[in-house]
């Protein structure tokens, strides 16, 4: 039996390796269109800046290793130009024809290249292959001073950081009003503040119009000089072969597969960035170009080829990215997605230290949590300096097992002062959600502050700044100053992070107040959003 694998990236290599471990007699051939196989694509931005200083480290496996260890033949520079499903053959480089019993289609995705004037400038690159990175390093070695990154996704943000690491004047341009689309504006604002503090010229709500000589011209008319530019505005599934041979393509442009990763042809499987998968939260088809899911899908294909009933159980979209000193992580749906899908939801923000506050060097982490009135988990996001991905991973695991906010509340997690608090942030998110569901607290948010009575409940002398037009009534005095708090108006209480205002709101709710809210995330989140907002306003004045 012969199995052909088209594409030697994460999904293809994973499928081939698993298949060999299950069957030592099968003939397995990987057909790779480029001269590289199984490279660490996700590390390319760090290789470009010499944070990863060895090219060899970027090669996860070699053709020799595949042959010596797994007895898998890898053919480089072997572009499949046609699939003949009826005859079960493929054509390589428009010349050689080879037959298959099973075919695994993992061609990946192509970077989006806008059709604008000057886009073929020799110093404009995408970051998809090791060859791309080599070319980028070659330009950087020629005393490059100005870098422009078009696109504020994960790769764009990572490339901007690594250009700054090399000492380049760096501009990042993003067409949307925020970077990092998988998270919401509040989490993105924290990351945007960090990028600006580190020296990135961040231009949001603006896009590439054309390239004029050695300048990037934006839709706004701004002109940015560059020695090197990166296109990181997204990817599209590579489906040319699939379309030409008549495989079913989904509404989002990816190859349609079932839960066994089988295409509309029972002899052809597909995985990785080229396929559409089912979203864990919404149940709708989605495109998730991530290495983790691609590797799992490859393994599932191998199992099914060998008769092991293995299914792909939807995609949660768990992701993490380094933004200078910050870490941003997320799982599930964000608020934008929930609004678009019509899913009803509740939300809360908390800011908690990375470990026990009394132990040295604790740093704050901002969390956003989305859930339903029934306690179902819809999504979580976090941004901080330490332990961020650890908490999101725990929530992702609870979600994967169809757990609820009550499972978060009850989770027994590791604790010692250098690592966490007795009530871990995962526990605290569950507790906050439970309080909201039970009506013990009504959360208010940044956009709710207008036309509300604002009460700063922090103790006098314990703070340097407050929210404009607020009055200060400390929690310790609130029972004796009820006459200063109106019952006929919306009242929003706030403190540093939201805990004291929750306590104060409980007092008022039990004193007959019904229109009392606690500012979720407190004034610390308010300051994060204000800093970002003011930075954007300053740009409009330039």
Regions found by a protein language model. Name each.
Residues 406-417, 421-453, 459-492, 496-542:
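Rhodanese-like catalytic fold shared by cysteine-dependent sulfurtransferases
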Residues 98-108, 226-234, 298, 375:
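Short hydrophobic core segments
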């Amino acid at each position: 039996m012969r199995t052909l694998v088209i594409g030697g990236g994460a999904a293809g290599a994973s499928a081939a390796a698993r298949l060999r471990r299950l069957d030592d007699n099968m003939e397995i051939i990987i057909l790779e269109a480029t001269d590289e196989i199984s490279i660490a694509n996700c590390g390319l931005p760090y290789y470009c800046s010499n944070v990863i200083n060895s090219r060899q480290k970027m090669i996860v496996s070699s053709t020799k290793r595949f042959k010596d260890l797994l007895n898998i033949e890898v053919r480089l520079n072997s572009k499949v130009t046609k699939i003949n499903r009826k005859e079960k053959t493929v054509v390589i480089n428009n010349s050689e024809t080879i037959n298959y019993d099973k075919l695994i289609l993992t061609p990946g995705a192509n970077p989006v290249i806008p059709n604008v004037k000057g886009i073929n400038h020799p110093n404009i690159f995408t970051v998809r292959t090791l060859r791309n990175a080599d070319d980028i390093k070659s330009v950087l070695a020629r005393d490059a001073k100005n870098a422009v990154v078009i696109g504020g996704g994960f790769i764009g943000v990572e490339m901007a950081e690594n250009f700054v690491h090399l000492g380049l004047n760096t501009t990042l341009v993003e067409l949307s009003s925020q970077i990092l689309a998988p998270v919401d504006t509040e989490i993105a604002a924290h990351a945007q503040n960090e990028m600006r503090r580190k020296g990135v010229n961040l231009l949001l709500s603006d896009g590439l119009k054309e390239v004029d000589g050695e300048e990037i011209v934006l839709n706004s008319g701004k002109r940015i000089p560059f020695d090197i530019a990166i296109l990181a505005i997204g990817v599209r599934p590579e489906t040319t072969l699939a379309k030409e041979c008549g495989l079913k393509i989904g509404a989002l442009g990816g190859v349609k597969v079932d839960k066994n990763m089988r295409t509309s042809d029972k002899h052809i499987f597909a995985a990785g960035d080229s396929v559409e998968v089912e979203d864990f939260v919404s149940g709708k088809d989605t495109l998730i170009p991530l290495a983790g899911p691609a590797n799992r899908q490859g393994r599932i294909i191998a199992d099914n080829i060998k008769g092991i009933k293995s299914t792909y159980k939807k995609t949660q979209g768990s992701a993490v990215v380094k933004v200078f000193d910050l870490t941003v992580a997320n799982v599930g749906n964000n608020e934008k997605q929930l609004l678009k899908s019509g899913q009803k939801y509740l939300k809360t923000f908390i800011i908690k230290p990375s470990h026990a506050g009394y132990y040295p060097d604790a740093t704050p982490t901002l969390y956003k949590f989305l859930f339903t009135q029934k306690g179902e988990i819809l999504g979580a996001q976090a941004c901080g300096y330490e332990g961020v991905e650890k908490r999101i991973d725990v929530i992702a695991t609870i979600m994967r097992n169809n757990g609820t906010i009550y499972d978060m509340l009850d989770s027994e997690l590791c604790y010692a002062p250098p690592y966490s608090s007795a009530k871990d942030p995962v526990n605290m998110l569950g507790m906050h959600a439970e309080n909201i569901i039970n009506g013990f607290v009504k959360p208010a948010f940044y956009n709710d502050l207008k036309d509300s009575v604002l009460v700063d409940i922090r103790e006098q002398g314990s703070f340097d700044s407050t929210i404009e037009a607020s009055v200060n009534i400390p929690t310790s005095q609130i029972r004796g100053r009820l006459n200063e708090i109106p019952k006929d108006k919306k009242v929003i209480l706030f403190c540093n992070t939201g805990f004291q205002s929750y306590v104060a709101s409980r007092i008022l709710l039990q004193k007959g107040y019904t229109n009392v809210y606690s500012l979720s995330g407190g004034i610390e989140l308010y300051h994060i959003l204000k800093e970002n907002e003011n930075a954007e306003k300053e740009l409009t004045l330039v």
